């Protein structure tokens, strides 16, 4: 079993928003990846973006700039 580490989890209302986030992050060299929404969190769709917790402000500004709507941003051990 892998060791859990603090992560920033960004959830979305729809799968389309999650996929759009993945595409934009790849195009703009933002680190992170799409993951299934962890059990500790409830979300509109089953996908979430996972990245380092110190990226919270950067990701919030990036999503606002790119027009990506998210449901929730939380830091959890993942």
Q: What residues fall within each predicted segment?
A:
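C-terminal structural segments of small proteins and small subunits
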Residues: 50-78
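Amphipathic, hydrophobic secondary-structure cores in small proteins
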Residues: 9, 15, 19-56, 75
């Amino acid at each position: 079993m892998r060791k859990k580490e603090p992560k920033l989890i960004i959830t979305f209302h729809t799968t389309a928003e999650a996929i759009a986030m993945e595409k934009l992050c790849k195009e703009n060299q933002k680190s992170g990846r799409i993951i299934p929404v962890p059990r500790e969190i409830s979300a509109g769709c089953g996908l979430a973006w996972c990245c380092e917790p110190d990226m919270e402000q950067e990701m919030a500004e990036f999503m606002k700039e790119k027009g990506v709507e998210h449901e929730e941003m939380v830091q959890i051990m993942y």
